[in-house]
Swiss-Prot record:
Function recorded in the entry: Catalyzes the attachment of glutamate to tRNA(Glu) in a two-step reaction: glutamate is first activated by ATP to form Glu-AMP and then transferred to the acceptor end of tRNA(Glu).
UniProt catalytic activity: tRNA(Glu) + L-glutamate + ATP = L-glutamyl-tRNA(Glu) + AMP + diphosphate
InterPro entries: aa-tRNA-synth_I_cd-bd, aa-tRNA-synth_I_codon-bd_sub2, aa-tRNA-synth_I_CS, aa_tRNA-synth_I_cd-bd_sf, Glu-tRNA-ligase_bac/mito, Glu/Gln-tRNA-synth, Glu/Gln-tRNA-synth_Ib_cat-dom, GluQ/Sye
Protein's name according to its UniProt entry: Glutamate--tRNA ligase
The species this protein was found in: Erwinia tasmaniensis (strain DSM 17950 / CFBP 7177 / CIP 109463 / NCPPB 4357 / Et1/99)
Keyword tags: Aminoacyl-tRNA synthetase, ATP-binding, Cytoplasm, Ligase, Metal-binding, Nucleotide-binding, Protein biosynthesis, Zinc
Length: 469
């Protein structure tokens, strides 16, 4: 049997982390088994579905590199197909027309709730005894079995059973002629030959209804696997209140797709004590039978730890392609200064996100208007004038501009003045970066460049002169 999975988001908002994890699990399962992965846009909610949301979903999938073999399919383009099947079901008797008014159904619901009963349709139109005009408004309901049970073996949760007596006759076509979500899903999974439906646990209650429809139309029932929800650190369902955002917001916040994928795969799945997984390892190892049925808590610190790992372990040239976007957001002109791959090497250990890296790299490329006040007060004092003059001259005299040469120049200045390296290094750091902290001074000065470094030392000496006056 050829494995075929699908990711079927509703385009009513962004691709959130829960949806991204579901997409990842479906994608990994298909890839592990040499199967196919289908992208389907479930846009039957015409009032809430938007093109902007569709674009956001596509952007998120593409950024995560979750490629699909078929699709994207759109349910709104398949209404004729759904209605054809509904008409066949009406003909076969597995569906029927319901003429009950909204008022009657609301009264029925209120009475049932008042009596402590579960609200459900009472089947008044099920046997079709009443005569109605051909053009009288009606919905179409599925004739759900009234006896027996629906049992399915959830690949994550084990056997789950629902009594058919608990299920009412589901509306499958509204009065306006539009087929309903639960019905469209069934026909799509049938037509697209989906073998494994991997989705959130909020769909468990839909499953018995969908299975009954599949059996009624003679379709193969797929294997189901329902993934547990993601919680915030307070144990409540993850929401905007916890900072839960769309996948692309993580891009905007400076995370690499590899870090987010690694983090998401571990939210409910494990392979021993291993924490770091490459995409190839995920595809090779992922199986549904080890996915936890317990909810997982989202931990931003863990995600940052993974992101820091990938910033420093992936090829700097690759990381630089993602850093470029953040540099552009900071409006930094990088035409003069180090290559971005070199910048990744310089700042990688100090930065947890690419956004942080972009925000802290401007001094490599552009002049700063003033020194950090605290750093200048502490290190650009009159006593620093001579160390800066000596190291300036030695840097200016270098014919071969290398990081090792810069280190030797700083050491030579300290030796000449008979002071520790810090007496030269700290004023030099503030002079060339404008701040009191930076990566290793020799590689920093080297990356800034000879002419720019010497000019900044001159600027620092002028600043010191104003303090001496």
């Amino acid at each position: 049997m050829k494995i075929k999975t699908r990711f079927a988001p509703s385009p009513t908002g962004y691709l959130h982390v829960g949806g991204a994890r579901t997409a990842l699990y479906s994608w990994l399962f298909a890839r592990n088994h040499g199967g196919e992965f289908v992208l389907r846009i479930e846009d039957t909610d015409l009032e809430r579905s938007t093109q902007q949301a569709i674009d956001a979903i596509m952007d998120g999938m593409n950024w995560l590199n979750l490629d699909w073999d078929e699709g994207p399919y759109y349910q709104t383009k398949r209404f004729d197909r759904y209605n054809t099947v509904i008409d066949q079901m009406l003909e076969a008797g597995s569906a029927y027309k319901c003429y009950c008014s909204k008022e009657r159904l609301e009264t029925l619901r209120e009475n049932q709730m008042a009596n402590g009963e579960k609200p459900r349709y009472d089947g008044r139109c099920r046997d079709g005894h009443e005569h109605h005009a051909e053009n009288e408004p009606c919905v179409v309901r599925f004739r759900n079995p009234q006896e027996g049970s629906v049992i399915f073996d959830d690949q994550i949760r084990g056997p789950i059973e629902f009594s058919n007596q608990e299920l009412d006759d589901l509306i499958i076509r509204r009065t306006d002629g539009a087929p309903t979500y639960n019905f469209c899903v069934v026909i799509d999974d049938w037509d697209m030959e989906i073998t494994h439906v991997i989705r959130g646990e909020d769909h468990i209650n839909n499953t018995p209804r969908q299975i009954n429809i599949l059996k009624a139309i003679g379709a193969q029932v797929p294997v189901y696997a329902h993934v547990s929800m993601i919680l915030g650190d307070d144990g409540k369902k993850l929401s905007k209140r916890h900072g839960a955002v769309g996948v692309m917001q993580y891009r905007d916040d400076g995370y690499l797709p590899e870090a987010l994928l690694n983090y998401l795969v571990r939210l409910g799945w494990s392979h021993g004590d291993q924490e770091i997984f490459s995409i190839d390892e995920m595809k090779k190892l992922f199986e549904l039978d080890v996915v936890s049925k317990s909810a997982s808590a989202f931990n931003t610190e863990k995600l940052q730890w993974l992101n820091h790992h990938y910033i420093n372990s992936l090829a700097p040239e690759y990381v630089a392609t993602h850093l470029q976007w953040h540099i552009e957001q900071e409006n930094i002109d990088t035409r003069t200064g180090p290559q971005l791959a070199q910048l990744v090497k310089l700042l990688g250990e100090r930065c947890k996100t690419l956004k942080e890296m972009a925000a802290s790299c401007r001094y490599f490329y552009e002049e700063f208007d003033e020194f950090d006040a605290d750093a200048a007060k502490k290190h650009l004092r009159p006593v620093a004038r001579q160390p800066l003059e000596v190291v300036r001259d030695k840097l200016a005299a270098m014919s071969d501009w290398t990081a090792e040469g810069v280190h030797q120049a700083i050491q030579a200045a300290a030796d000449e003045l008979e002071v520790g390296m810090g007496k030269v290094g700290m004023p030099l750091r503030v002079a060339v970066t404008g701040a009191g902290q930076s990566p290793a001074l020799d590689v920093t000065v080297h990356a800034i460049g000879q002419a720019r470094s010497v000019a900044r030392i001159e600027k620092a000496l002028a600043y010191i002169a104003t303090r001496e006056a």
